[in-house]
Amino acid sequence: MTQPRQALLDAFGVDLPDELLSLALTHRSYAYEHGGLPTNERLEFLGDAVLSLTITDELFHRHPDRSEGDLAKLRASVVNTQALAYVARNLSDGGLGVYLLLGRGETNTGGADKSSILADGMESLLGAIYLHHGIEVARQVILRLFGTLLDAAPTLGAGLDWKTSLQELTAARGMGVPSYVVTSTGPDHDKEFTAVVVVMDTEYGSGIGHSKKEAEQKAASAAWKALDVLGGVGKTSV
């Protein structure tokens, strides 16, 4: 096993057999280009169920007074593509994307940082962990990796809309409405956008994406983290 892959396993806090880990990292684009190898989609299916059950159970016990509808909204703020991608990007140096096995086409179009691909990869790895170690180990891994999002669930919008969540946070702290400065580079068919979020004349985060929306969401995510929401939900000062 290469050191980079061991670093990924260290981020999850588990060991996996080489064959199972490789399968969990194999995107269908890579499998297609290599003669129809097995893909990580079955593991993704399994991991999605394990993640949903674990988060649902945790929220049920954390919030005994919440209604079914409220619990569903809290779960939606944690179990969604953007939340999974957020965790994936912060796993280790370079995030999950650098470990994924992608086809040339996906690689050339930035697939290693596409939220949907990162989310699918997270679910497939969680499925692999469940398959090899069982539900209790998988549960512990999920609660550790998603713990800060679980803590912050009451402050997040459904679908982890970082711009909305950041605006709600700054409003609650009397910091006004965030503004975004967006620039772009590259030809029309392959533009790259950079967004910087400013709150009270101070830059709190930046993000790069293949669309203005993606760049702004990443910038808002960085700003939300910079304001210590993830490190201390409920703080009233920066």
UniProtKB/Swiss-Prot annotation:
The protein's location, in the record's own words, is: Cytoplasm
Among InterPro entries, the record links this protein to: dsRBD_dom, RNase_III, RNase_III_dom, RNase_III_sf
Indicate where this protein is primarily found: cytoplasm
Q: Which SUPFAM superfamilies does the protein's record reference?
A: dsRNA-binding domain-like (SSF54768), RNase III domain-like (SSF69065)
Organism's domain of life?
A: Bacteria
Q: Which residues form a coiled coil?
A: none
Q: Which cofactor does it need?
A: Mg(2+)
DRBM domain boundaries: 161-229
Q: Which residues form the RNase III domain?
A: 4-134
Q: Which residues form the active site?
A: D48, E123
- Molecular function GO terms recorded: double-stranded RNA binding; metal ion binding; ribonuclease III activity; rRNA binding
CDD domains (UniProt xref): DSRM_RNAse_III_family, RIBOc
Task: Indicate the quaternary assembly.
Answer: Homodimer.
The entry's family comment says: Belongs to the ribonuclease III family.
Enumerate the NCBIfam families for this protein. Answer: RNaseIII (TIGR02191)
The molecule here is called Ribonuclease 3
The species is: Mycobacterium leprae (strain TN)
- Gene for this protein? rnc
